[in-house]
Regions:
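C-terminal hydrophobic helical "lid"/dimerization subdomain
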Residues: 2-4, 282-335
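Glycine-rich beta-strand-centered segment in the early N-terminal region that forms part
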Residues: 31-48, 56-100
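NAD(P)H dinucleotide-binding glycine-rich loop of Rossmann-like/cofactor-binding domains
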Residues: 72-79, 89-155, 300
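N-terminal Rossmann-like NAD(P) cofactor-binding module of classical short-chain dehydrogenase/reductase
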Residues: 95, 152, 198, 220-221
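Short, glycine/polar-rich helix-capping loops at beta-to-alpha or helix-loop-helix junctions
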Residues: 102, 180-188, 257-263
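Mid-domain Rossmann-like dinucleotide-binding core that forms the NAD(H)/NADP(H) cofactor-binding site
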Residues: 125-203
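Short amphipathic alpha-helix with an adjacent loop that forms part of the alpha/beta core around
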Residues: 204-214
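Glycine-rich phosphate-binding loop and adjacent beta-alpha segment
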Residues: 227-301, 334-335
């Protein structure tokens, strides 16, 4: 019997600036058998996230960096094809840190089962996965929006931003999205129900904020950092809340990360700025998933997945995150 081959992308070097194909090495290994308490998963879909850029850095963070020569970390969903673990049986579908490869073999730490009969598998990487959990807890627990308030979201056409904006609408807020390009801004309003949009590629963000938020910004959900964060800080309302969810404009800097110049706006407006790491909310994922599932089933929230086929396309597909090409959740289908 011919041994099965596991294609893998390994971290070959730590990138300076944008990662490229040389950041990763490609390997093919034989698929092994699970030892005691291990499972073997055939990966079907992988989640491509801005956080992956941070995992490549040799720096202290909320989880250890990926080691040189290790399989590139990625969340994903797949099917258990062999198991020596009491909680997982052959045929189960699971969500976990599967890595950029055809098969995961190891202990299923943090893995949980998903049901493809209830929702398509890619949805468990978007609205029903870490993306949805991030949007849910960052907005509701940290941002604490109230009906009638103005919520501004950067990276609004991306995976987290598009869902966060829709949740804010459900809470009775006026929602303004910041995105790059007329097509994305149109999608925010026509498909996701945002009240307004600012095209940072083709207009001055400060002027757009003045137009769309005449009374100021009560909640700012920041996914990009940099100059856009600075622009929003100048428009904060009294007691505003700034949620730091990401800073994609800064992830590939070769120089030091740029800090906000207008931070004194927090002082004069009695506002607060708070960072958010989704894993802090892991004990509450079930409650959020239940509510998100209800919103999706009723059509109150729409989830958009940008699915690219082919494990071999991983290095190029990952770069779509940083060029702004993707619309919604970027997912890699393992062929």
């Amino acid at each position: 019997m011919t041994a099965q081959i596991n294609r893998q992308f390994l971290l070959a070097r730590r990138p300076q600036g944008l990662p490229d194909r040389e950041t990763f090495s490609y390997a093919e290994t034989a698929v092994g058998e699970p030892a005691e308490s291990e499972i073997l998963v055939r990966n079907e879909y992988l989640s491509l996230d801005p956080a992956m850029r941070g995992w490549m850095n040799d720096a202290k963070s909320y989880i250890p960096p990926v080691g040189i020569g290790e399989v590139m970390r990625a969340l994903g969903v797949g099917k258990v094809v062999a198991s020596r673990h009491a909680d997982f049986a052959v045929g189960d579908y699971v969500n976990g840190a599967l890595g950029v490869q055809d098969y995961f073999l190891g202990k299923p730490k943090g893995f949980y089962k998903v049901d493809p009969s209830r929702a398509p598998l890619p949805l468990y990487l978007s609205a029903l996965g870490m993306t949805g959990m991030t949007a849910y807890f960052a907005l509701l627990d940290v941002g604490q929006p109230k009906a009638g308030e103005t919520v501004v979201i950067s990276g609004a056409a991306g995976a987290v931003g598009s869902i966060a904006g829709q949740i804010a609408k459900l809470k009775g807020c006026r929602v303004v999205g910041i995105a790059g390009g007329a097509a994305k801004c149109k999608t925010l309003i026509d498909e996701f129900g945002f009240d307004g949009a600012i095209d940072y590629k083709n207009e001055d963000v400060s002027a757009g904020l003045k137009r769309e938020c005449p009374k100021g910004v009560d909640v700012y959900f920041d996914n990009v950092g940099g100059d856009i964060l600075d622009a929003v800080l100048t428009r904060l309302a009294h007691k505003a809340r700034v949620v730091l969810c990401g800073a994609i404009s800064q992830y590939n800097n070769k120089q030091a990360v740029k800090g906000p110049a207008n931070y004194l706006s927090l002082l004069v407006n009695s506002a607060r700025m708070e960072g958010m790491v989704v894993m802090s909310y892991a004990p509450r994922f079930a409650e959020a998933a239940q509510e998100m599932g209800g919103w999706l089933a009723s059509g109150k929230i729409k989830s958009k997945e940008d699915i690219v086929e082919g494990l071999q396309t991983f290095p190029e597909t990952l770069l779509k995150l940083f060029s702004g090409e993707n619309l919604g959740k970027l997912v890699l289908k393992v062929d």
